[in-house]
């Protein structure tokens, strides 16, 4: 036997062993298939090509043996490829399932975290709203208490000041001041001399005495000889609180004075600028108007309510003593009829209307003997001047009456 036949015989032996190992699990799976076939409906089996019976190796030629070996080798390669592909498919499927499982777990975890975050955010928001509401209530209560305390302090200070000047303030005694009427105040302060000599105006010495009395009433000597240590501490705390409050009031008053000074300066500057602009409009010296020590003139009446008379006193006095007499217009004298063109407009349309509207003139057919006019005829006289040289005292329309017999 040659070397090739020995190789082929060894390969055939190996192929037979592999076929036996493959047939063993196939036989083991056959009972399961039979059990499944009992339950499952009958299936149509496909026809397969008839299996050709292999010849024994002794009857095969070398070419057939080589072809058979190549065929078996090809089948083994295909089986190995199929097994490798199935294994890869199983691994890929397991990997995909694992990834899907991990994604679902992550999704569930994120959903739980989001729900937890929303719950915590809602809880924090509720706590913030409640805290803000409490702070607002506390702020309002504190503001109300501070307002009440300030009002009480103001009333107490007013009572203390009134008691320092007037001895003491009785409860329900009414107001401790008097309001002067407007007429009395105007009569008292009509001018500076009366204002200085008024009885209600305090002099400098009186103001100093009032100040000393007030300080003596406020700054009384405290008797601490019979006080216990705790009472002395309370008294010290009270004095310290009062000093702090007085310093705060002093600071507020100083700032208020500064603001008032600033406002006064600003108003004064505005007044100067207004006087300067007014002087420029009138053609006067702006520097003199702005730096004048006299206050600006205040117009008590509107310039639209009356006409401003800019004439001097001498002119007005002369006009008052010699009033201007109205001249009388010139009169046309005579009994003649005035010319037709007086007061008539030359217009063809108007002339045509007049011709149509005027009644026919009366023409005397038979003359009456001895007929005269009711008045003596006076020749027509048209003056050339617009006004009469002398005042006319007689009525020009009144003439001598003529009796008609």
From Swiss-Prot:
Disordered: annotated segments: 1-77, 100-156, 262-359, 377-405
A biological process term (GO) from this entry: muscle contraction
Record-linked Gene3D superfamilies: 1.20.5.350
Comp. bias intervals (Basic and acidic residues): 43-57, 262-272, 303-319, 342-358
Bias (Acidic residues) ranges: 1-36
SUPFAM superfamilies: Troponin coil-coiled subunits
An annotated Gene Ontology molecular function: tropomyosin binding
Family the UniProt entry places it in: Belongs to the troponin T family.
Function: Troponin T is the tropomyosin-binding subunit of troponin, the thin filament regulatory complex which confers calcium-sensitivity to muscle actomyosin ATPase activity.
Protein name: Troponin T
Organism lineage: Eukaryota, Metazoa, Ecdysozoa, Nematoda, Chromadorea
């Amino acid at each position: 036997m040659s070397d090739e036949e020995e190789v082929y015989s060894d390969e055939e032996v190996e192929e037979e062993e592999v076929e036996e190992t493959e047939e063993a699990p196939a036989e083991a799976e056959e009972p399961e298939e039979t059990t499944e076939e009992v339950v499952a409906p009958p299936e149509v089996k496909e026809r397969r090509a008839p299996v050709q019976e292999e010849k024994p190796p002794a009857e095969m030629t070398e070419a057939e043996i080589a072809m058979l070996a190549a065929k078996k080798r090809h089948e083994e390669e295909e089986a190995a490829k199929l097994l490798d592909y199935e294994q890869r498919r199983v691994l890929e499927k397991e990997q995909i399932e694992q990834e899907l499982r991990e994604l679902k777990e992550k999704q569930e975890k994120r959903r739980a975290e989001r729900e937890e975050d929303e719950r915590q955010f809602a809880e924090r928001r509720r706590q913030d709203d409640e805290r803000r509401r409490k702070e607002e209530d506390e702020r309002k209560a504190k503001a109300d208490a501070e307002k009440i305390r300030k009002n009480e302090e103001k009333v107490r200070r007013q009572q203390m000041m009134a008691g320092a000047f007037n001895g003491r303030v009785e409860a329900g005694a009414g107001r401790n001041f008097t309001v002067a009427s407007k007429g009395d105040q105007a009569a008292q302060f009509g001018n500076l001399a009366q204002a200085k000599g008024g009885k209600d105006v305090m002099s400098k010495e009186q103001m100093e005495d009032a100040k000393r009395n007030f300080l003596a009433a406020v700054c009384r000597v405290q008797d601490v000889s019979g006080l216990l240590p705790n009472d002395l501490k309370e008294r010290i705390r009270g004095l310290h609180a009062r000093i702090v409050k007085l310093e705060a009031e002093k600071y507020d008053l100083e700032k208020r004075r500064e603001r008032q000074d600033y406002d006064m300066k600003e108003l004064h500057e505005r007044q100067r600028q207004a006087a300067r602009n007014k002087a420029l409009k009138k053609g006067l010296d702006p520097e003199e108007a702005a730096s004048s020590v006299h206050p600006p003139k205040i117009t008590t009446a509107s310039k639209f309510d009356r006409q401003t008379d800019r004439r001097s006193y001498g002119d007005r006095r002369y006009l008052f003593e010699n009033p201007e007499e109205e001249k009388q217009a010139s009169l046309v004298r005579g009994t003649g009829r005035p010319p037709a063109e007086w007061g008539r407009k030359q217009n063809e349309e108007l002339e045509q209307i007049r011709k149509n509207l005027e009644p026919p003139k009366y023409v005397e057919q038979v003359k009456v003997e001895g007929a005269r006019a009711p008045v003596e005829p006076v020749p027509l006289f048209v003056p050339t001047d617009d006004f009469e040289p002398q005042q006319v005292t007689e009525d020009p329309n009144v003439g001598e009456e003529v009796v008609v017999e």
